[in-house]
Amino acid sequence: GACPGAAGEVRLIYFPEKRFKAKKEMTKWKKTTADEDFTAQWHLEGLSPGTRYVTVLEARKPGSQQTTAILRGGFETAPAKNARTSLTFCMTTCHDFIRTDNGLRGHKIYPAMEEINPSFLVHAGDIEYYDKPEPWALTVELMRFKWGRIFALPDNRSFYKSHTTYFLKDDHDTLKNDCWPGQQYGTVTFEEGMHLFNDKQFPSRTPRYQTVLWGKDLQVWFLEGRDYRSPNTMIDGPDKTILGVEQKSWLFK
């Protein structure tokens, strides 16, 4: 299972991999607290396009001046919108902890993708299943437990710490099977599940439906298929929707 979180302080150092004289950027130390599940996130700006960055995460005890843990990784930024360049990307979906195919190492797809070394990955949802056993995630705390556990698997962790990834959600990692706004699973409302994914686990752009350019030749479209959908029980008709009025209008434009 996942290790319990602990209060501490963390900071992120990042710099271009192949620019040896480039300045190393460094964030301020940030405290980890129980309210944020003992995690920290940063919104980075001013990154150069088409660049491989090295990341160094440092951690220490609260109030200490001594670094007690270091985690190295990296990510790649999209090329400039007019740049022509060769690239490879991967896409996956639907896995969870109780159905790993490589024991406690994780999922075999991750070492396979490491060999490809893609510019980026799209995980299209159902990253975890709240409504599967061991345990049934009927509270926000158990949902967070499942997130911590699956990303602690060595093969999964090794991949994600070094690769740019776009995370989309589906039903099982929002709330439960075939869910829609207004429903509840255990003690968790749909809106709470949506908030946990959108704002805590994988904060990104607002709105979450976006297009992203990777150079001149590739445009990736990301749709949001859960937040705005009509109930499955609604009678079929022109007003029944998966995307919602605003997202559908944006897509048509």
Walk through the language-model features, giving the residues of each.
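Metal-dependent phosphoester/phosphodiester hydrolase catalytic core
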Residues: 1-253
